Amino acid sequence: ILGSGDIGLIMARRMTLEGAHVKVVAELMPYSGGLKRNIVQCLNDYDIPLKLSHTVVDIHGKERVTGITLAKVDEKGKPIPGTEEEYACDTLLLSCGLIPENELSRELGVKLNPVTSGPVVDESLETNVPGVFACGNVLHVHDLVDFVSEEADRAGTCAARYILQENQSSNPGIDQESQYSDSDIGKASKMNDNNDPVIPLISTGCVRYTVPSAIHLSKMPDKLKVRFRVGKVVKNCAVDVYCNEENSEKRIKTKKRPVVAPGEMEEILLGREELLKYPDLQQLIITVKEG
């Protein structure tokens, strides 16, 4: 199996349970892209080896696969000559990442994040196209369905309120009960509303992206959960949020973490009141630092 994300790890276990002999899981990166518990439950528990910093450099066979050649890669991901290993096998599974399906979004003119390949959204999960909201794996790839359900509830609530606002309707039937109250969500916002400045969230260091990508302070809930992923494993670190620049005097919030890894989504909770303490706020910088 090439690829050690959660799908690759789970497929290693499933193939084993179905009677196949999984010889090895190879991963191009120097770390697994899956949850730690999946490495333990899907590989370690079944004595399936995981080779990090390895990739497939050759596939053997004509009518069907008869074997593959693995090689170690350097820090740039290029195969290192002389490190080749041959494995006799009849199947090669490729689990090399997920890309959100966003053809419809492109047709609508929705702006996409080049890192996630998903829409750029604000605190209401609304895109740059008014009335178009995004959540779940079409927005960014999730670890757990619980997070998808939470986002879906929030996006649905905001979309319903947007419709009510647009129709100037007071029909309460469309606004179903939700864990997000009126005070939490506020009115559905538009990222292109010139009367309400947009505060962008800037990812620096090993932080690859954030969801949301921007917020409107006037429409932000009392507490806003910002989710993000990192690009490498960092131990004994802190997630820092800054106002405008990375300066200790401008640090809004910090959150200690024993370790962060690309395979596990991180989050930090931002309070509206703590942001309002910075009247000169023009952008929020989110970074992860060791120590």
Where do the PLM segments sit?
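Ferredoxin-type iron-sulfur electron-transfer modules and their immediate structural context
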Residues: I59, L98-P100, E126, Q179, ...
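General structural feature for long, well-ordered alpha-helical segments within catalytic domains
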Residues: I7, M11, H21, L35-I39, ...
